[in-house]
């Protein structure tokens, strides 16, 4: 019975994430804002960058809130915020209006939803199945991008205002009933780590393994959101391909697939090794991308990048749970998610380099160097052993 309830929660979480995952198609919306309203590339990209910052910042608050109030209330609140943000953006179609409403308010709503459904689903499963369960839940966002890319392209064809309106109604109608199915298991949650962490938020920030995870999440998600933001333009510049939404959909499809694959692989070979493998795949794909000159070639490389990028959203929450326990998982994962907000700097730098150089090769080289650095860092990552020195303090050292 518990397994059935667990998968029901996981699938409901997948549905919520599917609806929340509209930002993965932002590059198409940005093109519409530029072509229809005359926004500059920086203006069109800025709401997404602000979304990343607000999303990651509010993940901390949402995670702590759901740890205490439960995931159902927080997810429902998130759905209402998402719908309101999209609907209101249709009536305030200025760079400042969309940035404030879609960037900040939508980011808060997304944090409430994503920060609640993943922890809730994970608590229903044993350690051996947490990677797979996490992969199933976060796959919703990847599938969303695959479906939303052509849908948003179609809606933007009728005007960005109409696109915001229709998407807003979708969110209001869709998230609320699914949120009613999101709940924690009764009684004690399944154990995750050998010695669960009870450190407070400022203590967790001093743990070496957490700092390493934050840096790795920063670089790798920053790499991914660079493609989410600029892929439509990259297709036109490097492959003379005007139907960039097809590459966006390809990236999204493999993004979704990567989440399931990463869950299965990490359950089998371990979290740290799976991370090293994922980062290495990203590095190799970026090296090949330097030579991209045709839609087919670029499509293959983008698919591999999407596969690796999707894996991040399975590997990192599963690793946080395995390393630090689930008692305060929402808070800990929220703190890690601030790295995604910092990763919003990467697409801004890529846009700046594109404006100076006329292509994205300089940005690709920057990402290659950064990914090589986190591969080395991942080789040093080991599961911590945690011992309580007192009620207030925890001492962490690496397993010998």
What function would you assign to each model-found segment?
Residues 26-31, 208-264:
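Extracytoplasmic gate region of multi-pass secondary transporters
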Residues 33-34, 65-66, 150-159, 235-236, ...:
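Interfacial helix-cap and linker-helix signal at transmembrane-aqueous boundaries
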Residues 57-95, 266:
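Conserved MFS/SLC helix-loop-helix module at the cytosolic interface between two early adjacent transmembrane helices
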Residues 97-112, 297-310:
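Hydrophobic core of transmembrane alpha-helices in multi-pass small-molecule transporters
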Residues 112-125, 311-324:
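Intracellular juxtamembrane helix-capping segments at the cytosolic ends
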Residues 137-183:
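Helix-loop-helix hairpin linking two adjacent transmembrane segments in secondary transporters
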Residues 183-199, 388-397:
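Flexible cytoplasmic inter-helical loops of multi-pass small-molecule transporters
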Residues 249-255, 260-261, 266-319:
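C-terminal transmembrane helical hairpin of 12-TM major facilitator-type secondary transporters
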